[in-house]
């Protein structure tokens, strides 16, 4: 497969447009109009991927080591870390292969490169879908633990969690294979966009409802102890800020990528859209950043997991 410049990506199935030149500034589109291009150096991209890789490997190792962390909630967190690991790993592999091909250090036939491209595309797409699914699964798990606290352990059992996890992985791999095989069809890209929006709405509805319940609970405690109302208001503000950060990070990191896919369908030849297409690698970098942030939000806030992580690190030395 011929390479088209230093930033040519193997992930061509989801990006039918050229990527950015190695600078930050104004570049011209095909009509000569200026476009703002933001280039992500390969070194920075690989470094972020490596940080994500190490971070998520530690999460998986810590959960696997401690049997106390083998509950459904931590199973979902472990699978989120594993899918994030695959997202960063597949993108790192793709970038490394591109650099080796362009340097002439990896000589192979075009058919082999094409097969490698298809494999990486399926791996990347399926791991992205899994990451989104497990973010939704964690939200559902927390929702059930709050609204059905007394029946939580009978509703969210370990066998059910394992079946849900297996279903997510199988469905993601199968759908990704179909998506990559029929990536030229607009319906495929629209399905991905709709899936992202569905996950965003699901998480927003569940977390907003959980925040409302938490505020009601805090208000009840305030009345019981005859404390002043500002304490409840302060709790509500902190909860709203936490919710805004959680959903904001999710939308900021994933939104641009799916906006790109939507624009590929809606305005592939429009001047403004063509300028946005040039920043495709930036959108992938934001997803890599999300794989770095996810453990900080969902895993490292657990004291039990952090203690196990310290044990893992001490044993490795």
Swiss-Prot record:
Entry's Gene Ontology molecular function annotations: melanocyte-stimulating hormone receptor activity
PROSITE patterns per the UniProt record, alphabetical: G_PROTEIN_RECEP_F1_1, G_PROTEIN_RECEP_F1_2
Gene Ontology BP annotations: adenylate cyclase-activating G protein-coupled receptor signaling pathway
GO CC, alphabetical: plasma membrane
Residue ranges annotated as Extracellular topological domain: 1-37, 94-118, 184-191, 267-279
The entry's keywords: Cell membrane, G-protein coupled receptor, Glycoprotein, Lipoprotein, Membrane, Palmitate, Receptor, Transducer, Transmembrane, Transmembrane helix
Topological domains, Cytoplasmic: 64-72, 141-163, 212-240, 301-317
Covalently lipidated residues, kind S-palmitoyl cysteine: 315
Glycosylation: residue positions: 29
Coiled coil: none
Membrane topology, record value: Multi-pass membrane protein
UniProt xrefs under InterPro entries: GPCR_Rhodpsn (IPR000276), GPCR_Rhodpsn_7TM (IPR017452), Melcrt_ACTH_rcpt (IPR001671), MSH_rcpt (IPR000761)
Residue ranges of the TM segments: 38-63, 73-93, 119-140, 164-183, 192-211, 241-266, 280-300
Subcellular locations according to the entry: Cell membrane
Function description: Receptor for MSH (alpha, beta and gamma) and ACTH. The activity of this receptor is mediated by G proteins which activate adenylate cyclase. Mediates melanogenesis, the production of eumelanin (black/brown) and phaeomelanin (red/yellow), via regulation of cAMP signaling in melanocytes.
Family statement: Belongs to the G-protein coupled receptor 1 family.
Subunit field text: Interacts with MGRN1, but does not undergo MGRN1-mediated ubiquitination; this interaction competes with GNAS-binding and thus inhibits agonist-induced cAMP production. Interacts with OPN3; the interaction results in a decrease in MC1R-mediated cAMP signaling and ultimately a decrease in melanin production in melanocytes.
PANTHER family per UniProt: G-PROTEIN COUPLED RECEPTOR (PTHR22750)
The protein, known as: Melanocyte-stimulating hormone receptor
Species this chain originates from: Alouatta palliata
Gene: MC1R
């Amino acid at each position: 497969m011929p390479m088209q410049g230093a930033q040519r990506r193997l992930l061509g199935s989801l990006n039918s447009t050229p990527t950015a030149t190695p600078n930050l500034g104004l570049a011209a589109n095909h009509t000569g109009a200026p476009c703002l291009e933001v280039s992500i150096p390969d070194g920075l991209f690989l470094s972020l991927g490596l940080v994500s890789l190490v971070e998520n490997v530690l999460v998986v190792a810590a959960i696997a080591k401690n049997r106390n962390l083998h509950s459904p909630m931590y199973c979902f967190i472990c699978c989120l870390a594993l899918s994030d690991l695959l997202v960063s790993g597949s993108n790192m592999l793709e970038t490394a292969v591109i650099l080796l091909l362009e340097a002439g250090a990896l000589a192979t036939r075009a058919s082999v490169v094409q097969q490698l491209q298809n494999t990486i595309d399926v791996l990347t797409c399926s791991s992205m879908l899994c990451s989104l699914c497990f973010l939704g699964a964690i939200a559902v798990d927390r929702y059930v633990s709050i609204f059905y606290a007394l029946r939580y352990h009978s509703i969210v059992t370990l066998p059910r969690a394992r079946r849900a996890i297996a279903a997510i992985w199988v469905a993601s791999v199968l759908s990704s294979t179909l998506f990559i095989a029929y990536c030229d069809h607009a319906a495929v890209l629209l399905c991905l966009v709709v899936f992202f929006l569905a996950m965003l709405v699901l998480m927003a509805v569940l977390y907003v409802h959980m925040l409302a319940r938490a505020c009601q609970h805090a208000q009840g405690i305030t009345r019981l102890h005859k404390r002043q109302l500002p304490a409840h208001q302060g709790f509500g503000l902190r909860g709203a800020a936490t919710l805004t950060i959680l959903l904001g990070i999710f939308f900021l990191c994933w939104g641009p990528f799916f906006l790109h896919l939507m624009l590929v369908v809606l305005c592939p030849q429009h001047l403004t859209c063509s300028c946005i297409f040039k920043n495709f690698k930036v959108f992938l970098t934001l997803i890599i950043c999300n794989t770095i942030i996810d453990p900080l939000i969902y895993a490292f806030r657990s004291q039990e997991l952090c203690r196990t992580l310290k044990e893992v690190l001490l044993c490795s030395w």
